[in-house]
UniProtKB/Swiss-Prot annotation:
GO terms for biological process: cell wall organization; pectin catabolic process. The lineage of its organism: Eukaryota, Fungi, Dikarya, Ascomycota, Pezizomycotina. It comes from Aspergillus niger. It comes from the Eukaryota. It catalyses: (1,4-alpha-D-galacturonosyl)n+m + H2O = (1,4-alpha-D-galacturonosyl)n + (1,4-alpha-D-galacturonosyl)m. Involved in maceration and soft-rotting of plant tissue. Hydrolyzes the 1,4-alpha glycosidic bonds of de-esterified pectate in the smooth region of the plant cell wall. Glycans are attached at residue 258. Keywords: Cell wall biogenesis/degradation, Cleavage on pair of basic residues, Disulfide bond, Glycoprotein, Glycosidase, Hydrolase, Repeat, Secreted, Signal, Zymogen. This is Endopolygalacturonase E.
Length: 378
């Protein structure tokens, strides 16, 4: 039953509502269909047409799955300028056709990009087709493998690369890039034919973090040529030239600052800890730390600093300073034919070095060190 008081109340409420101003409804434009598709589409590419199809369709896919892709000779698997947030997944074997050219075989760029390798996936460079003992210094022209250029706030993880023709990862112009659990396996190049197979070459980049890398190669495991805020930890480096700063010099950017190598093993390598700066050039190396580094079976130098790199017959020069160089708990063995520590500094370019718990033994003691900083033993 409806009472008279109810009717009066409803009438008053209706009058108030009709008299009150009504705010304009908040209108949100509907997303464009093509934008939704870009964010939601998963695309799978495979076979000999997979690389070109992926390159053409890359901006239409939020997830790009590369399954047993065969990249044609002389071409790049081009994953540059991806949409923000794109996820790239490698499955099976990615193979590359043979041609003498400079590469790269793979190139990725963008913001908030994730690149991962599925279980059992690997990128097979089949480098023996190019290996001639000359590396990038002559002989056949060899393609670099993987350009991680102009990546921002991105992650590369679980990638397995086998038998790179020459340098593997080129990291350039990137910031806030994390690389996790990367494997580089160039063991087949140990017959003396593979050369300059650097693991990670870093230039003009900031906030680069590399963790859990396992590298077997024939050159620098890591080479920081320029950049700031670089962190490498939990790595194993075998067969190559060790954990390196440089060579620094000869580029438009010759500044290296705030680099840490932490909790890593260097095995059966030519060098362990290494800083190399170009003779006669200018620049700076500062705030470099090697902490908890273990060396074993090093053939040439356990710890080496060369300020006459590229012209070792000349006296070192002062143009590139090495300041605030910290070694903390760096220990291990050098073969008897090698040298434990070798330092060649300019007359006034190596300052503020702090070495603690450094114990490198088994090799020779050098009598050729020059301008060794105070409180440092050569």
């Amino acid at each position: 039953m409806v009472t008279s008081s109810s009717v009066i109340g409803l009438t008053l409420w209706a009058a108030l509502v009709s008299a009150s101003p009504v705010a304009d409804p908040l209108v949100t434009p509907a997303p464009k269909l093509e934008d939704l598709e870009k964010r939601a589409t998963s695309c799978t590419f495979s076979g000999s047409e997979g690389a070109s199809s992926a390159s053409k369709s890359k901006t239409s896919c939020s997830t790009i799955v590369l399954s047993d892709v065969a990249v044609p000779s002389g071409t790049t698997l081009d994953l540059t300028d991806l949409n923000d947030g794109t996820h790239v997944i490698f499955e099976g074997e990615t193979h590359f056709g043979y041609e003498e050219w400079s590469g790269p075989l793979v190139s990725v760029s963008g913001t908030d990009i994730t690149v991962t390798g599925a279980d059992g996936a690997y990128l097979n460079g089949d480098g023996s087709r190019w290996w001639d003992g000359e590396g990038s210094n002559g002989g056949k022209t060899k393609p670099k493998f993987f350009y991680a250029h102009d990546l921002t706030s991105s992650t590369i993880s679980g990638i397995y690369i086998q038998n790179s023709p020459v340098q593997v990862f080129s990291i350039d112009g990137s910031t806030y890039l994390t690389m996790e659990d990367i494997t580089i396996d160039n063991t087949d190049g140990d017959d003396g034919e593979a050369a300059n197979t650097d693991g990670f070459d870093i230039g003009d980049s900031t906030y680069i973090t590399i963790t859990g890398a396992n590298v077997y190669n024939q050159d620098d495991c890591v080479a920081v040529n320029s950049g700031e805020n670089i962190y490498f930890s939990g790595g194993v480096c075998s067969g190559g030239h060790g954990l390196s700063i440089g060579s620094v010099g000869g580029r438009s950017d010759n500044t290296v600052k705030n680099v840490t190598f932490y909790d890593s093993d260097i095995k059966s390598s030519q060098n362990g800890v290494r800083i190399k700066t170009i003779y006669g050039d200018t620049g700076s190396v500062s705030e470099v730390t090697y902490k908890e580094i273990t060396l074993s079976d090093i053939t040439d130098y356990g710890i080496v600093v060369e300020q006459n790199y590229d012209d070792t017959s000349e006296s070192p020069t002062d143009g590139i300073t090495i300041e605030d160089f910290v070694l903390d708990n760096v220990q291990g063995s050098v073969e008897s034919s090698g040298t434990n520590i070798y330092i060649v500094c300019g007359s006034d370019s190596c300052t503020d070095w702090t070495w603690t718990d450094v114990d490198v033994t088994g090799g020779k003691t050098s009598s050729d060190c020059e301008n060794v900083p105070d409180d440092i033993s050569c």
